[in-house]
Amino acid sequence: MTNSSAKRIVISGAGGMVGTVLAGQARAQGRDVAAFTSAQWDITDAAAAEHLIRPGDVVINCAAYTDVDGAESDEDRAHLVNAVGPGHLARACARVGADLVHISTDYVFSGDRREPFEIDDDTTPMNVYGRTKLEGEHAATSAY
């Protein structure tokens, strides 16, 4: 049974660990879920977001280039997926009146602390992966 009064949940990167769990949990709660793997929805394609996102949707961006070591040698691809793609999603969401939840990483911080980081701590990524994910955060927030 679907909860018709709730907003549709749109998940990018639904083939990954976080996206798979989120889609399963949302469906188990009876939510209207549109879950897309990276093969089904390339978030680096700005036009694709315009066709998939509807007014009132809640878009959860789980899509990412997650190969931390690989990002060092494939910086262009990491930047495209982790920084440019979230910007496309955010602008499309802002245009149609959808909400965006962007999943990031603790790699945006330096990693040299023993206690948990707080949301307002300084960001000091130490590698390409962390830097591109931080760029994605900035791209997503600047659209709103």
Which residues are covered by each model-predicted region?
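N-terminal Rossmann NAD(P)H-binding glycine-rich loop of SDR-like oxidoreductase domains
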Residues: 7-28
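SDR active-site strand-loop-helix element
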Residues: 12, 36, 62-63, 100-105, ...
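Rossmann-fold NAD(P)-dependent oxidoreductase module
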Residues: 21, 25, 92, 139
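Adenosine-cofactor binding site in Rossmann-like domains, unifying the SAM/SAH pocket
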Residues: 27-49
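Helix C-cap/helix->beta junction micro-motif
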Residues: 29, 95-97, 143
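NAD(P)H-binding glycine-rich loop region in Rossmannoid oxidoreductase-like domains
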Residues: 43-81, 92-96
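Catalytic helix-loop patch of NAD(P)-dependent Rossmann-fold dehydrogenases
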Residues: 73, 80, 85-88, 108-144
